[in-house]
Amino acid sequence: MSQQPSGQGISEKIQNLASKYGQMLNELDKAVVGRYDSKTAVLLGLMTGFPTLLVGDRGVAKTMLIELLPKVIEGLNDKDVFVVQVSEYTDPSEIFGVPDIQKLVNGEGFDLKTDGFLPSAKVAFIDEIFYTSEKVRSTLLRAINEKKINVFGKEIKLPWIAFYAAANKVDLENPSDLALLDRFNIRGFILDIPFIMDNVDKLADETMQVMSASENPELKKVITLNDVEETRKVLDQMVRDFFNSKEALDLLKKVYYVIGDILASLKDTDAYESFYRSADEDYTHISTRARKRLNYVAASIALVRGATKPTYLDYLLALLFTLPVDVQSFKIVRDKIRDEWNKAVSGQEDTDATKVILDYLNDRLLTEAFIKASKMFDTSRNAIENLGKKIPLAQPFENREPTLVSSLPKIVEFLTRPEPISYSIWLMTKDKNGKINVGREKTGELSGNPLQKLEELLKLLESYRKVLDEADSPEERKTLILGLSKLVVNFGSTSSYQNGYKVPFLTLLDAISLFINNLKSTDVQKVIEQVVNDAKNNALKSISNGAPEVSGWEVFAPLLEQYGMKVPGILEAKRQIEDRAKGLSKNLDNTVTEIMNAGEKIMEMDDEMTKTFISLAS
């Protein structure tokens, strides 16, 4: 096709072009609702420069899409686009230009006026191309093949960068139609929705979109003619690099096996008899030109999604735009490709991509939120030291300050462990006579994400505050506080306290009080938003880097859904990440609010215990 691109690295060029082509499709969506098959065929024709045939009923936006190209491509004007609807009565002059009478009168010889006709067009569109007369058709064949025409002995080079044609149907029994059909390297079949009763929802949805859309939307020019030229150089390099790689041979064998299976399904069709059966009737024929166009179309699909080389899925989608030759063969190819595609994608869904990401959001995300908040403890050492100075150096509190400083990391470590943690503590209860007793040992488990564990811990501590509230007198309350001061909370792995940690009850209250105080002095919503966004972006990055062969399919998702083909699992994971992140922001905010409310009560208990010991020591 073209020379090797220079300047930026190939990967950077691909990312830049992929972004622009994605924007181009978005712009076209503003003016044409649905019709993703048409848009994709037009896009592939523009990228590759391959002549492209659009086959479909009237009113499926074939002409409209071509006429929209100047609105989205910088450097392409309306006058650069030649659109004509032909019939068997169309005169060659309506396509190739009219004689310049003035030059003949002036004795300057014969010439054509080509402004506004095919010879001056950068983009050409011939509607109902199979209705052309033989006289017009022979000239068109050369215009498509060689980008040249000869009119009255004058050789004219054609400047078109994209050549499109449209038809309602293809007559495979007409040799002349077959010759013309073979020149179109890309063929898009645009089928309207069959069986209205079976597609009520889709029809209603599309109608709503059409009726609510702006009649003349303002489109942006998001790509340039230079970008189109650069694309073809990049495609050359992508194809060249791919065929120099080790995986190319195995991948092509896999693709050709699918092609063989499809052609076997076509054996009783007109398409096979007219187009794919070789001169030796025992063999199926696929031309070198057809194999070449398949590689470039697959590379184009890969480029649009930002990949540096085509994959099996790119080739499968490319077959839909290169293999069928009429509506009947398209339906067979589409169904076979859909089955093979969904089988391949289902295999990818079994990978751990989605699970890993959702686990990340469910667990690691909240762990990071807690760790970020817990790091604020470091700024509270002065508060801890000041607290320690206020408390008399009497048993059991002589080590309160250093115990708290050393306990904080351990408390955070246990709360942020991914697995559940067990605990044991002695219960304080009030008997029927009103006497407060330290009763049996209570054991339990804190599970869930770190904030859920903290929430459960606060509920546990809340039960002791309720016991305090049931005290009948200040003296009884002091007695209870002294009893609480002797309690120790044991943390450990589930069902075992091996490698566990003992935390004095009061130290635990101090730690929670500091945590709640820090939350109160922090813009919690901002912290949550930052943590969620960081985690989401890291997840999106890791999932894309981990599976490049199934990344970037967002741009083709509507087309895949139109054909009944599953969107690769990586895209579904990304969607779930976005949805999960939104939900997590809200859930985190609610959880922190609940923790703050519960924490306030724990702080009151901690404050009362501190004041009690200060008063006892004075």
Curated annotation (Swiss-Prot):
Coiled-coil portions: 570-598
Superkingdom of the source species: Viruses
GO (cellular component) term, any one: virion component
Keyword Coiled coil: yes
SUPFAM superfamilies linked: P-loop containing nucleoside triphosphate hydrolases
Keyword Coiled coil on entry: yes
Cross-referenced Pfam families: bpMoxR
Keywords assigned by UniProt, alphabetized: Coiled coil, Virion
Subcellular compartments: Virion
Protein name: Structural protein ORF618
